[in-house]
């Protein structure tokens, strides 16, 4: 259902990370569907694991909507 992608976000690629080892300290921010800014995709996955949640990626970069020019 591609139409709903805007509402539900994109699945984070959590299988790409070894979450038991933790996440690299890189700043490549993603905004979760919980409207929280995560420093990188791995940290979003890590929080999902810790909290038993399924937060998805709402957008890459900050959570603020780009302001219209």
UniProtKB/Swiss-Prot annotation:
Site feature location: Reactive bond: 25-26
Domain of life: Eukaryota
GO CC annotations on file: extracellular region
Kazal-like domain: residues covered: 8-65
CDD domains linked: KAZAL_PSTI (cd01327)
Subcellular location, principal: secreted
GO molecular function, one term: serine-type endopeptidase inhibitor activity
Functional note: This is a trypsin inhibitor, its physiological function is to prevent the trypsin-catalyzed premature activation of zymogens within the pancreas.
Protein name from the UniProt record: Pancreatic secretory trypsin inhibitor
Gene (name only): SPINK1
């Amino acid at each position: 259902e591609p139409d709903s992608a805007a509402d539900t976000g994109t699945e984070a690629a959590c299988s790409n990370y070894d979450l038991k080892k933790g996440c690299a300290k890189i700043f490549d921010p993603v905004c979760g569907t919980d409207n929280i800014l995560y420093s990188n995709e791995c940290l979003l996955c890590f929080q999902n694991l810790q909290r038993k949640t399924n937060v998805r990626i709402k957008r890459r970069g900050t959570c603020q909507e780009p302001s219209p020019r």
